[in-house]
Swiss-Prot record:
The lineage of its organism: Eukaryota, Metazoa, Chordata, Craniata, Vertebrata. It catalyses: a globoside Gb4Cer (d18:1(4E)) + UDP-N-acetyl-alpha-D-galactosamine = a globoside Forssman (d18:1(4E)) + UDP + H(+); a globoside Gb4Cer + UDP-N-acetyl-alpha-D-galactosamine = a globoside IV3GalNAc-Gb4Cer + UDP + H(+). GO terms for molecular function: globoside alpha-N-acetylgalactosaminyltransferase activity; metal ion binding. The active site is at residue 298. One of its GO terms (cellular component) is Golgi apparatus. The chain crosses the membrane at residues 6-26. It is found in: Golgi apparatus membrane. It comes from the Eukaryota. This is Globoside alpha-1,3-N-acetylgalactosaminyltransferase 1. Glycans are attached at residue 108.
Length: 347
C-alpha cells in the first residue's frame, strides 16, 4: 500500500511539473510582452516596445561610410530641398502655405510648445510668448508648457483663442550642464504624464529666442530636426560631435549628415516621447561611466538623429543666430536667438 501511494505521489508531481513546464513554454513562445521604464506611468498608447518575443532586436541604421549631404549643394544661393533618405528640407519657397492650411486646418490639431525658463532665463519668457502669439501656428490650437523653478517670475501674456499656457514647476540645479542634461528626461516624463492627452504634435525649443516670421504646418512631421546655423556650410569633420569612443554619443569622422541644433526639435507626440526617452537613456549610460558628452544633450540629439533619421528637416531659417548676417541662401528668418551675455545668464 505504501509503495502504491508513493508511486501515485510521484506520478502526480511529475504531471504537475509537465503542466507547469508546458504553460511556461506557451507563455514564452506565444504571449508577446513589452517593456516600459519603471518610472514612467505611461498609458497603453505609450507602451512602446523595445523587443517582442519572436522578433530580432532592433538594429539602428548601420554605421557605414557615405557622402555628406551639403545644404548648399546646388548653388550658393539655393538650399538643398531633399535629404538622401528622402526627407524634405523645409525653407521659404518649398511649400504652399495656403494649400497646407486647407489640408491641416480641418484636422483640429493641437500643437504643444515646450520651453525651459530656469534662473535668469525667465527674463526671456515675455518676448518669446509675444512673438509666438504673433507668428507660431496661427489658426491652430496651441498649448505652451513652461518649465521653471520660479513660477511667480513668469509674466502673464495675453493669449489668443484656443491657446493655453501651463507653468510646470521644476527643480533648479546648481550647474547649467546639469539643467541641460535633465531636459530630455523632463520632456519624456511630461509626455507620459500629460502631454499625450493634450497635444498631437510637440515642439521643444529654447526660450531665449523669438519668432520673426510665420511658423506653420509646413513644419509638422513624425520627427523633425533643425539644421544648426553655425555648421550648415562646413564639412562634417568640423562638426562638434562627441569624438570620444567611451561616450554613447560618439560619432566617427565618416558619419553624420547635418549638424542639428538642440534648440529646436519636435514631431508627433509619440515620436518625441521615443526620441527624448532614447536620449535620456544614453545620457544615463554616460553618467554611469563618469562622462559628460561634449555638448551635453545636443551631442546625444545628434547621435540619435544619425541612427534614427528625422522625417523632416528644417533649414536654418527656423533656427538662426542674430549675431550672423543673413546669407543670400536664406530668404527670411523665422526663429532666431537673442544676443545675450551667456556667462551672466548661467551664473
Amino acid at each position: 500500500m505504501r509503495c502504491r501511494r508513493l508511486a501515485l505521489g510521484l506520478g502526480f508531481s511529475l504531471l504537475s511539473g509537465i503542466a507547469l513546464w508546458s504553460l511556461w513554454i506557451y507563455m514564452e513562445t506565444w504571449l508577446p510582452f513589452s517593456y516600459v521604464p519603471y518610472y514612467l506611468p505611461c498609458p497603453e498608447i505609450f507602451n512602446m516596445k523595445l523587443q517582442y518575443k519572436g522578433e530580432k532586436p532592433f538594429q539602428p541604421v548601420t554605421r557605414s561610410p557615405h557622402p555628406q549631404p551639403k545644404l548648399l549643394e546646388q548653388r550658393p544661393t539655393e538650399l538643398l530641398t531633399l535629404t538622401p533618405w528622402l526627407a524634405p528640407i523645409v525653407s521659404e519657397g518649398t511649400f504652399n502655405p495656403e494649400l497646407l492650411q486647407h489640408i491641416y486646418q480641418p484636422l483640429n490639431l493641437t500643437i504643444g510648445l515646450t520651453v525651459f525658463a530656469v534662473g535668469k532665463y525667465t527674463r526671456f519668457v515675455q518676448h518669446f510668448l509675444e512673438s509666438a502669439e504673433q507668428f507660431f501656428m496661427q489658426g491652430y490650437q496651441v498649448y505652451y508648457y513652461i518649465f521653471t523653478n520660479d513660477p511667480a517670475g513668469i509674466p502673464r501674456v495675453p493669449l489668443g483663442p484656443g491657446r493655453l499656457l501651463s507653468i510646470i514647476p521644476i527643480q533648479r540645479h546648481s550647474r547649467w550642464e546639469e539643467i541641460s542634461t535633465r531636459r530630455m528626461e523632463t520632456i519624456s516624463r511630461h509626455i507620459a504624464q500629460r502631454a499625450h492627452r493634450e497635444v498631437d504634435y510637440l515642439f521643444c525649443v529654447d526660450v531665449d529666442m523669438v519668432f520673426r516670421n510665420p511658423w506653420g504646418p509646413e513644419t509638422l512631421g513624425d520627427l523633425v530636426a533643425a539644421i544648426h546655423p553655425g555648421y550648415y556650410a562646413v564639412p562634417r569633420q568640423q562638426f562638434p560631435y562627441e569624438r570620444r569612443h567611451i561616450s554613447t554619443a560618439f560619432v566617427a569622422e565618416n558619419e553624420g549628415d547635418f549638424y542639428y541644433g538642440g534648440a529646436v526639435f519636435g514631431g508627433r507626440v509619440a515620436k518625441v516621447y521615443e526620441f527624448t526617452t532614447g536620449c535620456h537613456m544614453a545620457i544615463l549610460a554616460d553618467k554611469a561611466n563618469g562622462i559628460m558628452a561634449a555638448w551635453q544633450e545636443e551631442s546625444h540629439l545628434n547621435r540619435r538623429f544619425i541612427s534614427h533619421k528625422p522625417s523632416k528637416v528644417l533649414s536654418p531659417e527656423y533656427l538662426w543666430d542674430d549675431r550672423k548676417p543673413q546669407p543670400p541662401s536664406l530668404k527670411l528668418i523665422r526663429f532666431s536667438t537673442l544676443d545675450k551675455a551667456t556667462s551672466w545668464l548661467r551664473s
